[in-house]
Design a protein with these regions (language model features):
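Feature captures the catalytic ectodomains and active-site-proximal regions of enzymes
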Residues: 1-174
């Protein structure tokens, strides 16, 4: 799972440039964070996107909007993203996620970055597993107001920074 920043940035840029959605107004941002992790933001002005979709990561279920680890075996296959409700925006969003997954696998397979990694006997960058879709911050009260104190958070990972932002805590990098 070790991916150099240069490779992560290069693959992200390549995906952003080469992925073409069936909805021509749809754009994608692939932002490398730490190690092998990225955030993927799909945006389109043509329709509101939904967080009510399944994960493509076979090791995690989406239960009540939360990612929950599954008991899994050795071989895992990327799952197709499905709508969790019979609404047009959920179906539309699931379709965009599936288009992203299918195209990104092909793009990474043919990438010059992967050819270079192969020459260096490094593992190939093969897919991006998506989980825990969201289209808005959760509506939670500020922890500072709730407890009438001033809280802060020492953060090291993007998820910790996100939690501190949602709860309106001041964040300090570790």
């Amino acid at each position: 799972r070790h991916i150099e920043k240069e490779d992560a940035d290069g693959i992200a840029k390549e995906l952003e440039e080469k992925i073409k959605f069936s909805d021509p107004d749809t754009k994608i941002v692939v932002a490398p964070t730490i190690g092998h992790r990225v955030t993927v933001r799909i945006r389109t002005p043509s329709q509101k996107l939904s967080s009510k979709i399944t994960n493509t990561d076979p090791a995690y279920s989406n239960i009540g909007g939360m990612g929950v680890a599954k008991a899994v075996g050795d071989f895992l296959k990327i799952e197709k993203c499905l709508p969790l409700e019979d609404e047009e925006n959920s179906k539309f969003t699931a379709n965009l996620v599936n288009e992203f997954s299918e195209q990104s696998i092909k793009i990474m397979k043919e990438s010059e970055i992967n050819k270079k990694r192969q020459e260096q006997n490094k593992k190939q960058l093969s897919c991006i597993l998506l989980r825990d879709a969201g289209n808005k911050y959760p509506d939670v009260p500020s922890i500072n107001e709730k407890h009438e104190m001033k809280f802060s958070c020492i953060v090291d990972m993007p998820v910790e920074l996100g939690i501190s932002e949602v709860l309106k805590m001041e964040a300090f990098e570790a």
